Amino acid sequence: MKKLLITLLMPVLLLPNIAKAADTNGDVGEQFRVLHPEVWSVGVLIDDSANLKKQWVSLQAFTGTKPGNTGQIVDIQNCSSYGTKGCESSKYFNYQAMLPYCATESAVNCISNVVATGPDGVSHKATFVEEFPGKTKYSFVGDPSANLPDSGSNFIVSIPDMPHSKGDKYLIASQLNGNKQGADPKFNTGRFQTGIYAVTIVDGRYQVPFSSIELSHYPNAYIGNTAADNSGWDYGINAMPKCAQMSETRCALAWPLPLDVDFELTFRMQVEIKGWLHGRLQDAGANISSSNGLETIKISGKPVVVPIVYKTFPRDQVPAVVTQYYANDPNFEQFGYHFGSATGQISTVKGLEQFSTGEFPEALVWYQAISDTAPYSSTAWSFRSIQSGQLGNGCNNDSSTLKGLVTTNSNMYVASPPVFNKAEQSLDYQVTSPHFLPDGSVFKGNYNLVINSDFARCIYGFTQAPISATVAVLSADGSSQVATTVLNEKNGWLRLSASNFTFSAPTIRVLLTQEAKPTPEPEMTTQAAPQSKVKRITITCAKGKLKKTLSSSNPKCPNGYKKVA
């Protein structure tokens, strides 16, 4: 099993030589980058922030060896539109698009509103500044009938009343990707991801990432693979760039986000966003509504501090806990980020970024190797999509809606919906992280679950009556931690959170309950007791020759009459 885990981690990626061992020049964590070790080394990288940075757009058509353009790749074309020469609809397609600012009321697949709310509860609407990076030579025109969005661009806004430490500019970076099989009439939506960055803009000369059309860059050469020609380059310092986003002449440098500001993004989407979202938010909120074939999605929350684990060791100084773990794995140095030339001394950095429970044991080994202390940390406001998975009771049959949002500040977590624990009748969620931050302080975790109320009721078979919940944080040994927990239900969404728990590998267990509808007591009715039949007495009374017969319960003869019978 361990061999399989390593195999799935990361394709081999050769990166340029760099003469620095680590980012030791005082850069803030928001500008973290992986640099070349000075000597032949082995190391680890556990950081999901890089996937959101330095985005690019592309629309590519693939020709394959088998019918329907499947099988091995024989040709790749960059496309500026769909269905044109070389980009015929019969081919296999991959696309990467950015979601721009909604410039008009009729614009779709865009972000219509950016709002920041301070600790005083006052909200401030952001002002659009510019598209960034703007249009590039890889931009393309979408096709709504084929569910293909325009290539778009990320953008920068200004929020003067909610500044960060270096100014009031914020980069809104949102990306959508998808694909289309040759025989399919429409594109399938793949990953949807978004981040907010506090930025300043600097001038320079940069190589921006782009999708390669060189077959040699596709090691397996099968339809469905994607490849970037490079991860970007800063010609000014001859190194990988620190930019969160860049053009050929400008760089958006990221700085710490204000942790007490709640940011809210509103998306106006024609392309459906479904399943689950996961990410880096505190006090997370989600809302979705549909009208006239469009979805309006609102995601809100505060930034969090996330540990970044990156450490390399000279090959002859790898800690024993690491060498023992990989002792029986012949592929230990075959999979990961590879640095250097083909000299036999190619440094390997293991990239743990599948975010699955299978990687947790490996992560815990590396935590031990770094004394359970994260070398870096960064503020983050981000989320991305995942599929619904199988959460029991057939409740995922409606795949057209957003089911929920799970967020945490943990270095590593399971990037899927909470697992329904049938034995405990609970929703379980696993996280793991180093115990300490770079400054030596104890790292305190948080967890937020926002789940569609109808979906939660379906899982448990609940009625529409109110739901209550308990949230327990269980340490690795099964003991329960003391944590602050919150539950509320509003506008069709259940919101639960747990905070201030410690690591290294706790499980968050959410138990939803609902009081049974009281069985009505039998209605008490009072019936009149049946009246007993009154006994009637008959007498005969006489007065001279006159006689009267009287009948009653107590008959008496009239005055002047005498009872004779």
Regions found by a protein language model. Name each.
Residues V115-G118, H124-T127, P144, P149-S151:
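Long amphipathic alpha-helical coiled-coil/heptad-repeat bundle
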Residues D23-S123:
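Charged, amphipathic alpha-helical stretches
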Residues A529-A565:
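Mature, structured domains enriched in cysteine- and short glycine motifs
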Residues M1-A22:
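Secretory targeting and sorting signals
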Residues L15, I73, S81, Q96, ...:
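Processing junctions and N-termini across compartments
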Residues S158-T538:
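Extended, non-transmembrane interaction/recognition domains
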